[in-house]
């Protein structure tokens, strides 16, 4: 016998679906507007969502090609967008790998080992993580200015220095991975130890394979944070060719000239690495956000 839903329930479903549609539209509208701006002629921030005439000049400039106009003028690419994109991907990728490695080993120590001051260290790490990075900009500049005199590849105006600065933000990831490790039964490692495995082998061959979902989550969050970060990168990087895309895109918007079309094309390009990482790690990301680990 078919079940008939009461009118009140149908009304709630209708309102829920309308609310979801409005929410999706609110999310998609800025993205569609940025794409529309990148396809318009000229550098204007206002206009219709669907351009009257599609122009690829902003995309050609963003990809490093010159644009020849009808009157014979040639506009060269104003900035090395693809170089900035490569710098961003390189810094974000190395940073994410380093954060996963450091966070995993630290989390293992906090989850499985006993040592004096463990609780104090955990709380201290979390408290320091609550302070915004902008409060440490002066100290970071002084630190890397001095470090560059002894270790040039992690000084000012180096990608190594930016990566080294980003590696300091692992406290929250340590807490996240530690919580996941604690949901995995320690008897699995004890069984491996009985079979002759060393603590390192038990960690590498037993615990890490079971923790791939949470490691994927940490990698993605670290990658996104590094590729979109501006204050620290803009402080440490000076040369235009060493900029990340997030820092370099500010060059399009100066008081003398606002290149909104070029800015929009570069903004869309900046979303490609994050989208690819999400697509490649989607399966592990869902498991890491929903699974609780292996019990028993």
From Swiss-Prot:
GO CC annotation, single: plasma membrane
CDD domains in alphabetical order: TM_PBP2
Matching SUPFAM superfamilies: MetI-like
InterPro entries: BP-dep_ABC_trans_perm, MetI-like, MetI-like_sf
Membrane topology according to the record: Multi-pass membrane protein
Keyword line: Cell inner membrane, Cell membrane, Membrane, Sugar transport, Transmembrane, Transmembrane helix, Transport
GO molecular function: ABC-type maltose transporter activity
GO biological process: maltodextrin transmembrane transport; maltose transport
Residues in compartment: Cytoplasmic: 1-12, 112-123, 176-204, 281-296
Major place of residence: membrane
Residues of the ABC transmembrane type-1 domain: 85-281
Periplasmic topological intervals: 36-88, 144-152, 228-257
Cellular compartments annotated: Cell inner membrane
Transmembrane segments: 13-35, 89-111, 124-143, 153-175, 205-227, 258-280
Function: Part of the ABC transporter complex MalEFGK involved in maltose/maltodextrin import. Probably responsible for the translocation of the substrate across the membrane.
Summary of subunit composition and partner proteins: The complex is composed of two ATP-binding proteins (MalK), two transmembrane proteins (MalG and MalF) and a solute-binding protein (MalE).
Family membership noted in the UniProt record: Belongs to the binding-protein-dependent transport system permease family. MalFG subfamily.
Protein name as it appears in the record: Maltose/maltodextrin transport system permease protein MalG
Organism: Salmonella typhimurium (strain LT2 / SGSC1412 / ATCC 700720)
Encoding gene per record: malG
């Amino acid at each position: 016998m078919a079940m008939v839903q009461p009118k009140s329930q149908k009304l709630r479903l209708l309102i829920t679906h309308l609310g979801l549609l409005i929410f999706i539209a609110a999310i998609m509208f800025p993205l569609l507007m940025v794409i529309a701006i990148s396809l318009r002629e000229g550098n204007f921030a206002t206009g219709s969502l669907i351009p009257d005439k599609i122009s690829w000049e902003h995309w050609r400039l963003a990809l490093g090609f010159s644009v020849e106009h009808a009157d014979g003028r040639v506009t060269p690419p104003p900035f090395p967008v693809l170089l900035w994109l490569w710098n961003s991907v390189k810094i974000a990728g190395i940073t994410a790998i380093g954060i996963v490695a450091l966070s995993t080993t630290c989390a293992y120590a906090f989850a499985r080992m006993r040592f004096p001051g463990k609780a104090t260290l955990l709380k201290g790490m979390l408290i320091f993580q609550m302070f915004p990075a902008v409060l440490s900009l002066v100290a970071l500049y002084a630190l890397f200015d001095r470090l560059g005199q002894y270790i040039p590849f992690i000084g000012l105006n180096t990608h190594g220095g930016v990566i080294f600065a980003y590696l300091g933000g692992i406290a929250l990831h340590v807490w996240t991975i530690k919580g996941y490790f604690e949901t995995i039964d320690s008897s699995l490692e004890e069984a491996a130890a009985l079979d002759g495995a060393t603590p390192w082998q038990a960690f590498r061959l037993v615990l890490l394979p079971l923790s791939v979902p949470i490691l994927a989550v940490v990698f993605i969050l670290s990658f996104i944070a590094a590729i979109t970060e501006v204050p620290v990168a803009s402080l440490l990087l000076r040369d235009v060719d060493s900029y990340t895309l997030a820092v370099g895109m500010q060059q399009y918007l100066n008081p003398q000239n606002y290149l909104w079309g070029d800015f929009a094309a570069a903004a869309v390009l900046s979303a490609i690495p994050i989208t690819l990482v999400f697509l490649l790690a989607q399966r592990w990301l869902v498991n890491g956000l929903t699974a609780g680990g292996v019990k028993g």
